[in-house]
Amino acid sequence: MKKTLIIIPSRMQSSRLPGKPLLDMEGVPMVIRVAIKAKESNVGDVIIACCDKEVYEVAKSYNIDVVNTSADHVSGSDRIYEALTKIDPLKKIETIINLQGDMPTISSNSINNLVNLKHSISSDIFTLANEIKDENEKIDPNVVKVAMSIKNDNRYGKAL
């Protein structure tokens, strides 16, 4: 069986919050906290894909695998693709999880549930989503929203 890889795209020049990956979250940088949660899931290797020396060095200091990528990417998906071509040139990895580096509260169970869903449903793309309960988040343009419907016990959604 081919393996699963979790890649966390990261860059210090976030337009909304520069320096976000290294923000202190109870003594641990945010991107590292996310990587630790990913490792706790035990679904596969965890790698941070970054273009910043600071993030690279911090990841190494926490014994998190890290890959240098170009600073010119327009999206995290582009950064992940570059990292993947460096990590897996023979294309042996079957499942790639794009885990956002600004999700320090994600549970390892959520990651496991996503992988389990992939094994039980025939689809190529899966996205984790939660119900928005905070009224301010519902109108915040910086919060990604998903419109969902349920059909035959499957959930179908579209990011808004």
Where do the model's predicted regions map?
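N-terminal glycine-rich phosphate-binding loop and ensuing alpha1 helix
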Residues: K2-C50
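Short beta-strand segments
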Residues: P9, N98-Q100, L128-E131
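Short, high-confidence coil segments that cap the C-terminus of an alpha-helix
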Residues: V43, K91-I93, S120-D124
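Short phosphate-binding loop-to-helix
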Residues: K53-N116
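Conserved core of the sugar-phosphate nucleotidyltransferase
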Residues: I106-L160
